[in-house]
Amino acid sequence: MNINKIALIYNKNSKHLAIIEEIKKLYNYCKIEEAEVIIIIGGDGELLHNIHRYMHLNIPFYGLNLGSLGFLMNPLDTKKLLQNIYESTVSILHPLLMQVEDTSGQIYKALAINEVSIFRKTNQVAKFRIDVNGVERMSELVADGALVATPAGSSAYNLSAGGPILPLASNMLCLTPICSFRPRRWHGALLLSTDTIKFEILNITKRPVNATADFQEFNNITRVTVKSTKDKYIKLLFNKNHTLEDRIIKEQFGE
């Protein structure tokens, strides 16, 4: 991938400003809107926030890890930065579209790259009904919550909640309960990326529920609809010897 214009995005309060300044001295950079590649310096959180902010530009993102985990990032190598981008592989991610309705009847929409999650707002467990493609699949799930994860997000919150890791090209979604109380032995479901999942919240007054799309949170929700978007996509760049597919496979074997 040949590039001439790069943009740099980083947290100006980062403790790694010395490294960031070194990168700025080594490479010419331009305004974000003029870039051929947007380089996000930091961790997964910094990357996700800026993907949400700039995905409408349809410019590829390259994450440079200065955080802790950095699952969606590339290892720091200031000297070979442009070479690594030239030789990088592209992963195409389709975000989830979440539509929620709250107790006032207000409807909100948000995109999620990793997962959509719904969870109890108080000490009372949540109760909700689950429909898939308009068909009731579970009349009542009693749990702390539930989530729908993309393949890219399946190794994040979904994995911590006991859900499976999905291969990036699987065209599937994870539906995973969070601390399920009833049915106690239900561990979730694997669904097609073309499926539409709907959660109807039960006993809302006593058991209020919130919903999030990645880091965007909505309060006092009555229903949530989740589906994958095909008309929106994100291009993430990864070093040729450090692809997202390889990382997902390694994660399944505990590497």
UniProtKB/Swiss-Prot annotation:
NAD(+) binds at residues 44-45, 49, 114-115, 144, 152, 155-160, 216. The lineage of its organism: Bacteria, Pseudomonadati, Pseudomonadota, Alphaproteobacteria, Rickettsiales. One of its GO terms (biological process) is NAD metabolic process. Belongs to the NAD kinase family. It catalyses: NAD(+) + ATP = ADP + NADP(+) + H(+). It holds the Pfam family NAD_kinase_C. The keyword ATP-binding applies. Involved in the regulation of the intracellular balance of NAD and NADP, and is a key enzyme in the biosynthesis of NADP. Catalyzes specifically the phosphorylation on 2'-hydroxyl of the adenosine moiety of NAD to yield NADP. GO terms for cellular component: cytoplasm. Its EC number is 2.7.1.23. InterPro entries: ATP-NAD_kinase_N, ATP-NAD_kinase_PpnK-typ_C, NAD/diacylglycerol_kinase_sf, NADK. Keywords: ATP-binding, Cytoplasm, Kinase, NAD, NADP, Nucleotide-binding, Transferase. Its cofactor is a divalent metal cation. It comes from the Bacteria. Its main location: cytoplasm. It is found in: Cytoplasm. The gene is nadK. It comes from Rickettsia prowazekii (strain Madrid E). This is NAD kinase. One of its GO terms (molecular function) is NAD+ kinase activity. The active site is at 44 (proton acceptor).
